[in-house]
UniProtKB/Swiss-Prot annotation:
It comes from Yarrowia lipolytica (strain CLIB 122 / E 150) (Yeast). It is found in: Nucleus, Nucleolus. GO terms for cellular component: catalytic step 2 spliceosome; FAL1-SGD1 complex; nucleolus; preribosome, small subunit precursor; small-subunit processome. The lineage of its organism: Eukaryota, Fungi, Dikarya, Ascomycota, Saccharomycotina. The gene is FAL1. A motif (DEAD box) lies at residues 173-176. Residues 55-225 form the Helicase ATP-binding domain. This is ATP-dependent RNA helicase FAL1.
Length: 397
């Protein structure tokens, strides 16, 4: 059952365009019957705060900037809107979702297929690290929706396999990351291939001012549904730091923490691939069962690790920020920032992995003497407080 924290919904303050109404039920959104069936079968009962505001605006054809916290149903917001708009009688691609990671693109594909189960919708994950010939075959056969990463989608467009002439909607998920330096040019290149009337939807947990400025280049009079930045700390998440003075002490601190806590599932974040590999080996050498993932791994290995972690066969995942955006594993109760993120926007994406949909979660940050300034900067940016971890932290889990 997919549940949202209703108390959290009530507390959200939307800095929203004036003409945005709240639609309190899915029935009152005037959706297709088969789509409604899919929504209820998926486990949704009533729309979350972002869904009750954004879905009807997107369905009207408005360019939309939607910002909401992790765990409030952003993926379903654009998936439901898109499924309402596409015509399943035609096989050509009518909607494209771009995501910053392969895992997120694949997860979005599975949400779209589940919600569109009774509509017989065709949705393909167009991602790097997979067979080009399979991509080409699937796209040639006709896919109403493509969920992919910018590089592979652009490649397929240039090869003439992903045809955009009938595209109605472009969705940028985790837009802050997509529009950052690494993906900006690819996004602009893709946009040049789209029909002039293509509707653009931008969705993200954080939307820095620079990103909002950038969207003005390819959005027309967008409706804005925004959460004020100081509301972006995640309710129900307890945030702590442990002072470790120097880098060399972090590993012993982690082992001590393991002896103290009973962990359902946890994610440990490091800033580099090298550190992920090193820490994974150290943990295994000390008889801890862990798995790890970073961007250098082959796609089939990353898929296999994600499946293990999602199913609960693996309880601890060590990763770089490749995992930090939008991957929903419902049982994650603890996030450890072995390294504080170098980019403060990524902090909320990392800790947003725990306590999703209103469950309680704990985020623990290892802070060396050199990290204290970064920690205070994160506190100030999100108007939040990160306390030193108490001795009785087990009672908080």
């Amino acid at each position: 059952m997919a549940e949202f924290d209703r108390d959290l919904d009530d507390e959200l303050e939307f800095k929203t365009s004036k003409d945005v109404d709240v639609t309190p039920t899915f029935e009152s959104m005037d959706l297709k019957d088969d789509l409604l069936r899919g929504i209820y079968a998926y486990g949704f009962e009533a729309p979350s705060a972002i869904q009750s505001r954004a879905i009807t605006q997107i369905i009207k054809g408005r360019d939309t900037i939607a910002q909401a916290q992790s765990g409030t149903g952003k993926t379903a917001t654009f998936s439901i809107s898109m499924l309402e708009v596409i015509d399943t009688k035609h096989r050509e691609t009518q909607a494209m979702v771009l995501s910053p990671t392969r895992e997120l693109a694949t997860q979005i594909q599975s949400v779209i297929l589940a919600l569109g189960d009774y509509m017989n919708v065709q949705c393909h994950a167009c991602i790097g690290g997979t067979s080009l010939s399979v991509d080409m075959k699937k796209l040639e056969a006709g896919q109403q929706v493509v969920s992919g990463t910018p590089g592979r989608c652009l490649d397929m467009i240039k090869k003439g396999c992903l045809r955009t002439k009938n595209l109605k909607m472009l969705i940028l998920d985790e837009a802050d990351e997509l529009l950052n330096k690494g993906f900006q040019e690819q996004i602009y290149d893709i946009y040049r291939y789209l029909p002039a009337a293509t509707q653009v939807v931008v969705v993200s947990a954080t939307l820095p001012h620079s990103v909002l400025e950038m969207t003005s280049k390819f959005m027309t009079d967008p409706v804005r549904i925004l959460v004020k930045r100081d509301e972006l700390t995640l309710e129900g998440l307890k945030q702590y730091f442990i002072a470790v003075e120097q880098e060399e002490w972090k590993f012993d601190t982690l082992c001590d923490l393991y002896d103290t806590l009973t962990i359902t599932q946890a994610v440990i974040f490091c800033n580099t691939k090298k550190k992920v590999d090193w820490l994974t080996q150290q943990m295994k050498d000390n008889n801890f069962t862990v798995c790890s993932m970073h961007g250098d791994m082959a796609q089939k290995d990353r898929d296999s690790i994600m499946n293990e972690f999602r199913s609960g066969r693996s309880r601890v995942l060590i990763s770089t920020d490749v995992w930090a955006r939008g991957i929903d594993v419902q049982q994650v109760s603890l996030v450890i920032n072995y390294d504080l993120p170098p980019n403060r926007e990524n902090y909320i994406h990392r800790i947003g992995r725990s306590g999703r949909f209103g469950r309680k979660g704990v985020a623990i940050n290892f802070a060396t003497n050199d990290d204290i300034t970064t920690l205070r900067d994160i506190e100030q940016y999100y108007s939040t407080q990160i306390d030193e971890m108490p001795v009785n932290v087990t009672d908080m889990m």
